[in-house]
């Protein structure tokens, strides 16, 4: 439904890629359009090194002959999608199950550019369940402890979904996903990472019906 808007956001973000950059390459449907467009630039002589945030994105990069290297200390820009964002640049991420690697790459990048369609905007984060990656060990108890914070929680695909790190994803439905919940949830033993991304995004590329709006996050 919003495929053209996702493509618009990806194409606009690609204009910021320069020779010899080391870039984070995200996961998901919008990131696919970015990878597809990046492959054309590489084919035409652009020199970059990519740090994919999931095995799926790594496979895509390699199939498009995009150089990949995980042994990079400094990342210039991370390009990734989001499930939801608010006016302050807070994000919900992890719908594709790659939130741990996505957060590692975003945190270690000088800039974090978020590519979305117009439907991903919310005044308050509430539309998308909050993904939380947890260790399999005593995971039922971890879920119970998360629910004590006031949400309805369930294992993604009844534990059939396994992250690239070998863990489960718990999807949490809050009436409002307060960004402050990130630290509270991370204090629960068994929690690996939380899909709230605070103070990380620097630009948001929001695809629209007739172009792309670039939002500078203050």
Curated annotation (Swiss-Prot):
SUPFAM superfamilies: D-ribose-5-phosphate isomerase (RpiA), lid domain, NagB/RpiA/CoA transferase-like. Its EC number is 5.3.1.6. Pathway: Carbohydrate degradation; pentose phosphate pathway; D-ribose 5-phosphate from D-ribulose 5-phosphate (non-oxidative stage): step 1/1. GO terms for molecular function: ribose-5-phosphate isomerase activity. GO terms for cellular component: cytosol. Pfam families: Rib_5-P_isom_A. Keywords: Isomerase. It catalyses: aldehydo-D-ribose 5-phosphate = D-ribulose 5-phosphate. The active site is at 102 (proton acceptor). InterPro entries: NagB/RpiA_transferase-like (IPR037171), Ribose5P_isomerase_typA_subgr (IPR020672), Ribose5P_isomerase_type_A (IPR004788). One of its GO terms (biological process) is D-ribose metabolic process. The keyword Isomerase applies. Substrate binds at residues 27-30, 80-83, 93-96, 120. It is an enzyme of class 5 (isomerase). Belongs to the ribose 5-phosphate isomerase family. Homodimer. Catalyzes the reversible conversion of ribose-5-phosphate to ribulose 5-phosphate. This is Ribose-5-phosphate isomerase A.
């Amino acid at each position: 439904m919003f495929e053209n808007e996702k493509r618009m956001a990806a194409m606009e973000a690609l204009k910021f890629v320069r020779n010899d950059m080391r870039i984070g390459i995200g996961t998901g449907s919008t990131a696919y359009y970015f990878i597809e467009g990046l492959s054309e630039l590489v084919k035409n002589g652009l020199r970059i090194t990519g740090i994919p945030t999931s095995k799926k994105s790594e496979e895509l990069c390699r199939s498009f002959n995009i150089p990949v290297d995980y042994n990079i200390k400094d990342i210039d820009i991370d390009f990734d999608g989001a499930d939801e964002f608010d006016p302050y640049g807070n994000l919900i991420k992890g719908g594709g199950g790659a939130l741990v690697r996505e957060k590692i790459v975003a945190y270690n990048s000088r800039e974090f550019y978020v590519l979305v369609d117009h439907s991903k905007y919310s005044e308050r984060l509430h539309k998308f369940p909050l993904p939380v990656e947890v260790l399999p060990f005593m995971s039922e108890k971890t879920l119970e402890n998360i629910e004590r914070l006031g949400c309805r929680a369930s294992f993604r695909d009844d534990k059939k979904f396994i992250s690239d790190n070998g863990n489960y994803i718990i999807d949490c439905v809050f009436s409002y996903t307060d960004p402050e919940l990130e630290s509270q949830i991370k204090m629960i033993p068994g929690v690996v990472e939380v899909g709230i991304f605070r103070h990380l995004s620097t630009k948001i590329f929001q695809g629209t019906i007739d172009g792309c709006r670039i939002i500078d996050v203050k």
